[in-house]
Amino acid sequence: MDLRPEEVSAIIKQQIDKYGNKSHVDDVGYVLQAGDGIARVYGLNNCMSGELLEFENGVFGMAMNLEEDNIGCVLFRGERDVKEGTLVKRTGKTVEVPVGKALIGRVIDPLGNPLDGKGEIETEKFRPIEYPAPSVMDRKPVNRPLQTGIMAIDAMVPIGRGQRELIIGDRQTGKTAIAVDTILNQKGKDVICIYVAIGQKASSVAEVINTLEEGGAMEYTVVVSSTASEMPTLQYIAPYAGCSIAEEFMYNDHKDVLIVYDDLSKHAVAYRAMSLLLRRPPGREAYPGDVFYLHSRLLERAAQLSDELGGGSITALPIIETQVGDVSAYIPTNVISITDGQIYLETELFYSGQRPAVNVGLSVSRVGGAAQIKAMKKVAGALRINLAQYRELAVFAQFGSDLDKVTKDKLIQGERLVESLKQSRRATMPVEDQVIVLYMATNKYLMDLPVKEVRSFNKEFVKFVNSNYPEIPNEIRATGDLSSETENMLKKAAEEFKDQYLRTKR
């Protein structure tokens, strides 16, 4: 074997040049105590609040309590693998979630892991789950409508892009149905939708996903799911993760985003469970003292951004479940005071057949009125007061049969207004069709019709206008207004159709 000293010395010199004596230092601690999804960690003196911690067996947790001699850490998964003495190291970063267009059409958990069996999510973008809300100067007033396709809401409790509108009511009153119908109605409107399921049954989440797929809504929707069987930690971070995904579309793609939190009552319960296990002092209803901040910092991230920042928006629809209609409980009053209005659903209305079961008296939209289209304002202006008068008179009418003509007329019209506002699930209506129906209802064209025929009459009238007078819906769609010329045309169409309808019924 022929040895070449010059080659050997060249290789040695090369190795010496490449050699670096950099040592990698990890901040490491160990577990003092573990159980119930909580680990007490000793030795991580420089740990940040909310920092992601990695345990030696690949389990991750989040630092929540920074105490004098230890850290209270909540675990995401794998609590059985964490025992006394398990090594823990800092990651130096807070909890992040993958974001970007790759998530559209996918079902993920709050950490960004896919749950739909469609393979890994290919994205290099990440955002922290906690992010500061836009300042006052970064925002502009809400001035564009977000149509839900539900007439009772679009007419009387209008929602604008960038608004936070609470959906509140007892269980089984159609809260999720309203949110899902609103997502379905965004088809073709260039709105990205995010549905965050917190503490729901897995079967309920699967049903929602199935509804969205059937309606073609998964093409523009991301589902973040943390079911009731998950650790409270994952339920706690789910809405923040969903909001970070929405912020990526709002800040960087300048898109309009709709996010549904279903529901924040279960979110507060998960946070309460975590806080009590961490030995934080309990307050009213055993919730910790910062439960208001829990929801306010989440909902303040919804905004209509200024034109300088691209003009994107996040519209939030948080859902709260009440117990026996008690809106004065702790969490409902908190969220009512944070949001820009609420849609209150009532059990009695639901079981009496009025669906959506919106209680018009208790529902309000504080900023959406500025975003409502002019045509809707014209036809629905007196709707709320007419319905309120009808409800009041209906109560008195139960006690006496001798009513004057004005009262009888108000009762007859009220019945037909209520009937016109009824809508089935997954039967959303374009705003121009809503204007046509409400014009008919508010201008007393339905007075001499039997109540049971009102809905079929309205449906036929919309078809009649769209086929015989297409310029009416076209103008409302294009301008958002109902000019006097168009109104005259609509009046003519209404009279023509009613004559035709009554002749066929005779």
From Swiss-Prot:
It catalyses: ATP + H2O + 4 H(+)(in) = ADP + phosphate + 5 H(+)(out). The keyword Glycosyltransferase does not apply. GO terms for cellular component: plasma membrane; proton-transporting ATP synthase complex. It comes from the Bacteria. It is an enzyme of class 7 (translocase). The keyword ATP-binding applies. NCBIfam families: atpA, PRK13343.1. This is ATP synthase subunit alpha.
